[in-house]
Amino acid sequence: MRLILVRHGETLWNEQHKFQGISDIELSPKGMSQAKKLAESLKEEALAKIYTSPLIRARQTAEQIARYHDCQVIIVEDLKELNQGRLEGLTVEELHRDFPDFLKNWIHNTESAQLPEGESLGELQSRAWAAILRMKEEHPKDTVAAVAHSFVNLTILCRILEIPLQQFRKLRQEAAAKSLIEFTEKGTILRGLNDTCHLSRI
């Protein structure tokens, strides 16, 4: 399987540096432009299916990709972003002010630290990777796209690169970025990471 792993376009909360999590925030005008450019960059791909998180910012991005392809858009609950609980809607400054104990735990126990009334990264990785394996089983020889979120994609990439979640901060997933992963009989290959060349004119 060739997997094109996509992050959704930008939202107003992204621009305001707020934690989104599972809050259902639409693409901003800039984010919609990014999604359209991303879709154009994928129009020559022979996509068997487009999978997407149920959150609207991902679905809007997937719908733009689908304009160029005669294939289904499938909603996958396990591609939903990390449930960030009480952190959702906060800025980084508010996080540091209101949840200093959580931050200390997050830094030292990144995989297992439970977000206040939310998930841990380990829990997210388990469900997101299970979704990828289901795609691989259904499409062993196909190219598919999966539209998800920053933390979702980062945990998938950590699994592919066989690095601990503690190291996720060394990776980036920009708005409307795409990464290319190939699953072969000999192993998994990361062919492209966080590609945003298609956004150069926005």
Predicted feature residues:
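Extreme N-terminal starter segment of soluble prokaryotic enzymes
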Residues: 1-4, 49
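Generic beta-sheet signal
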Residues: 3, 142-150
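Loop-to-helix element that buttresses phosphate recognition and phosphoryl-transfer chemistry
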Residues: 10-64, 68, 115-129
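Short active-site segment of divalent metal-dependent hydrolases/proteases
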Residues: 11, 152-153
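Short, basic/glycine-rich phosphate-binding loops at helix/coil junctions
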Residues: 15-18, 101-115
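Phosphate-coordination/substrate-recognition cap region in phosphate-metabolizing enzymes
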Residues: 39-103
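Acidic, low-complexity terminal tails and accessory targeting/binding regions
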Residues: 71, 75, 82-96, 137, ...
